[in-house]
Regions:
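SF2 helicase/translocase ATPase core recognition
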Residues: 100-101
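CheY-like receiver
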Residues: 145-164
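Glycine-rich, charge-decorated loop segments at or immediately adjacent to ligand/cofactor-binding or catalytic sites
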Residues: 104-117
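Conserved TIR/SEFIR loop-to-helix hotspot centered on a Trp-containing motif
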Residues: 74-94, 106-108
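C-terminal helix of von Willebrand factor
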Residues: 124-148
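Conserved N-terminal substructure of TIR/SEFIR domains
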Residues: 1-70, 90-94, 104-105, 137-140, ...
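Short amphipathic alpha-helical segments
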Residues: 29-32, 81-84, 110-112
Length: 165
């Protein structure tokens, strides 16, 4: 088990929920540290309270997040937990930004759910380079924008839907 790179965010400011497979901790943690180093608040499973029902903590963190950062690998694409988190986020109008850490193909169900969301090809890049590519889109989404099919952004309303502004 790799050491946790930093505490998960627990404040009231906008934050990103990180979706990854535990099997990928060694690959994922440098990316988390690099994005966190860009000043972006991240919640990941380090934020699950001891003794709490983990599924409730995860659902609460997903509902409170402005965006989900999905670190796509063969392990995360095969993970039922990752599928559940992505489906829950999209069902609650939380946008998902996928970053491909390795060459992998999404399952048909993930392709269906994520087909209207832009992704970042991060293969061949180190964690710092990937963080540089995702920090701008994450910052825009944290400021209240949501990606649309046309690539434009709209403000999210408090109810979680898109609204014009």
């Amino acid at each position: 088990m790799a050491p946790k790179p930093f505490p998960a965010y627990t404040g009231d400011a906008p934050y990103v929920f990180v979706c990854y497979a535990h099997d990928d901790e060694t690959a994922a943690y440098p990316d988390l540290a690099a994005v966190h180093g860009q000043g972006i608040n991240l919640w990941y499973d380090e934020g699950i309270s001891p003794g709490h029902k983990w599924s409730e903590d995860v659902a609460d963190a997903l509902r409170g997040s402005q965006v989900v950062l999905f670190l796509a690998t063969r392990a995360s694409v095969a993970s039922n937990h990752c599928h559940d988190e992505i489906n829950f986020a999209l069902d609650h109008a939380v946008p998902v930004l996928t970053v491909y850490l390795e060459d992998t193909e999404l399952t048909p169900s993930l392709r269906l759910r994520l087909s209207s969301h832009q992704g970042v090809i991060g293969t061949g890049l180190d964690a710092t380079e990937r963080a540089a590519r995702v920090s701008g889109p994450l910052s825009r989404l944290l400021d209240g924008g949501t990606a649309t099919r046309s690539g434009r952004h709209q403000k999210r309303t408090r109810a979680g839907g898109a609204g014009r502004s």
